[in-house]
């Protein structure tokens, strides 16, 4: 019942919801959470001090996130997460080029995604709600049938 049309419809919203949970771009990281829903641990005072005037690959620290614990330095990691491809039974999302950063952040206790928890519960709940709406809409198109769901 969940077809390619459904997955194409929700993929952009799933990416947006993931970014909102993990990075909180609108709030500058103030409400950002790890994939398991826990707050990010504080950075060490030395790290915070060193990032003040830091440039990575010629890019300065993202000013909006300067005072947050969200894993955003230049914004590259935030922008890297996205849709990868459609498959017959869904779609894949992930970090296209910044996977090593994600792994290193996990080693430091800042988990953005894991094998056990690939997406936050809030994103999974969003997908389930959208799937339910889509299935009901598709079933309503079929008149006079009996369904045991």
Show which residues each predicted segment covers.
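Short, Lys/Arg-rich flexible segments
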Residues: 1-149
